[in-house]
From Swiss-Prot:
Gene for this chain: atpF
Protein name: ATP synthase subunit b
UniProt xrefs under Gene3D superfamilies: F1F0 ATP synthase subunit B, membrane domain (1.20.5.620)
Keyword Cytoplasm assigned: no
Membrane topology: Single-pass membrane protein
UniProt record similarity statement: Belongs to the ATPase B chain family.
Known function: F(1)F(0) ATP synthase produces ATP from ADP in the presence of a proton or sodium gradient. F-type ATPases consist of two structural domains, F(1) containing the extramembraneous catalytic core and F(0) containing the membrane proton channel, linked together by a central stalk and a peripheral stalk. During catalysis, ATP synthesis in the catalytic domain of F(1) is coupled via a rotary mechanism of the central stalk subunits to proton translocation.
Keyword Cell inner membrane: yes
Amino acid sequence: MNFNATLIGQSITFIFFVWFSMKFVWPPIMNALETRKKQIADGLAAADRGKHELELAAKKAGDNMRDAKAQAAEVIAQAEKRAAQIVEEAKLAAKEEGDRQLAAAQANIEQEANRAREGLREQVAALAVAGAEKILRREVNAQTHADLLSQLKAEL
């Protein structure tokens, strides 16, 4: 066996194997590697986008929370203001009712006082008439007149 012929045969076989591999085996391997490389790049990009979206969502959630707190504080302030207003209205209504009742009581007292005065006037008039009647029936003398007036004073 000739060593040169074997070496040439092996070289031709190796060249054929390299050509066959470059023509039929290498392109699918390169395509698979490119596809995998693209998938990895897409995954990393998606992870970056997801991270960015997560940051935006966290920021938006914080903004929404601040807005909700502000709205809640505003609602509470309005409720407190309305409660104070209701209390003031109730105080005013109570004061008006008290003033009205006081005025009614004063009017009632005034009416009762007027009735009492009128009654006293009638009694004084009756006593005066009775006294005058007694004076006219008796003799008119100073001592009797003074006694009758003292008696009338005592009765008044």
